Amino acid sequence: MEVNVLQSDMPKDMQNLIRGFIVQGFKRKVEYEDISKYIKDECDKKFGEEFLCIVVDKNTGFGSCLKCAPGSLFMGEYQNNRVILFRI
């Protein structure tokens, strides 16, 4: 299964790495808290910045409004889940 990028203003190479972290997070972990922590930790290590990651089931009627600095937002879908990642 592939991660669909819904919105991102991050560079393409960064997006591709994040997509890989998302797939690995879902393969290695079960609970949403553990998945989001895995993705966040991998991004923190790789990019040397602090990120916040939110993972939710998209079938639960999730909605969100985020305001971030330019070049800091990634939002994608994997299976029936939505992943939102941004630099803080």
Regions found by a protein language model. Give the residues of each.
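Charged, amphipathic alpha-helical regulatory modules used
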Residues: M1-I88
